[in-house]
């Protein structure tokens, strides 16, 4: 399974909404500008996310999108499944050697476990350890 730009950009939309959760609606235009992405492409991606209940649209001059649930209730797996379909890195064939079949199943389950245990809250609050500021004492 290779995650396409649909999945990558969909995660970007959702992470940006999670970062601004509780602050009101966020426009796709601002997400597109912040991440240097095509607003038109993001509009195509937000429709299935809205239909799945992962985001809600707010109309009006100050409208935009908000998360459909709390950031800790939405997983990366939820988003990827909506945009990419079932999570299956390799098609498991019944007539394949048992050892290889077991390997493919273990790989599939490991990928699912990572995606299903990573919440939007985790992704939105992630900080790279190297970005920590130095503390100078006098």
From Swiss-Prot:
Question: Keyword Glycoprotein: yes or no?
Answer: no
Annotated GO biological processes are: protein heterooligomerization; regulation of DNA-templated transcription
SUPFAM superfamilies linked to this entry: Winged helix' DNA-binding domain
Concerning Gene3D superfamilies, the annotation shows:
Winged helix-like DNA-binding domain superfamily/Winged helix DNA-binding domain
List, alphabetically, the GO terms of the cellular component aspect: cytosol; protein-containing complex; protein-DNA complex
Q: What happens when the gene is disrupted?
A: Grows slowly with cystine as sole sulfur source.
Keywords (alphabetical) are: DNA-binding, Repressor, Transcription, Transcription regulation
Superkingdom: Bacteria
One annotated GO molecular function is: protein homodimerization activity
Q: Does the keyword Transcription regulation apply?
A: yes
- Please state what the protein is called: HTH-type transcriptional regulator CymR
Q: Which organism is it from?
A: Bacillus subtilis (strain 168)
